[in-house]
Design a protein with these regions (language model features):
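Short S/T/G/P-rich N-terminal loop/turn motif that feeds into the first structured element of a domain
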Residues: 1-55, 62-68, 72, 95-97
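C-terminal structural segments of small proteins and small subunits
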Residues: 67-92
Length: 97
C-alpha cells in the first residue's frame, strides 16, 4: 500500500501563541492516526528554483486514506480551531509512489 503524506508550508505566522496551541492539539491527533513527523524545519533550509524559504512540515502516514482521515478528524479540527488565523499555510495531502 502506498503511503500518504502531509506537506505543509507556512507562508506566514502572525500569532506564535496560537501556533503553540495548535501544535499541542495537532501532534497527538496526527499520531493517533499513525502519523510520523519526518521534518519540522525551523533550522537549515536551502531553497532552489524560485523556491521560498518557508517553515515546512512533512508527516508520513501508512496510507493516503489515513492521512486524509487524520485531517478530517474531530481532534484535528479542534487543533485548526486553536490556530484560527494565526498562520497562513499551504497544506497538501499527497500519495507516495
Amino acid at each position: 500500500m502506498k503511503k500518504g503524506y502531509w506537506v505543509v508550508a507556512y507562508r506566514s505566522i502572525s500569532d506564535e501563541s496560537a501556533l503553540r496551541a495548535y501544535a499541542a492539539l495537532a501532534t497527538p491527533a496526527i499520531q493517533s492516526f499513525g502519523g510520523r513527523f519526518l521534518t519540522r524545519s525551523t533550522g537549515r533550509i536551502e531553497v532552489h528554483e524560485a523556491g521560498l524559504r518557508l517553515r515546512t512540515v512533512v508527516v508520513e502516514f501508512d496510507s493516503y486514506d489515513k492521512a486524509l482521515a487524520a485531517y478530517e478528524s474531530e481532534a484535528y479540527r479542534k487543533a485548526l480551531q486553536a490556530l484560527g488565523s494565526g498562520a497562513e499555510r499551504d497544506h497538501r495531502i499527497v500519495e507516495g509512489v
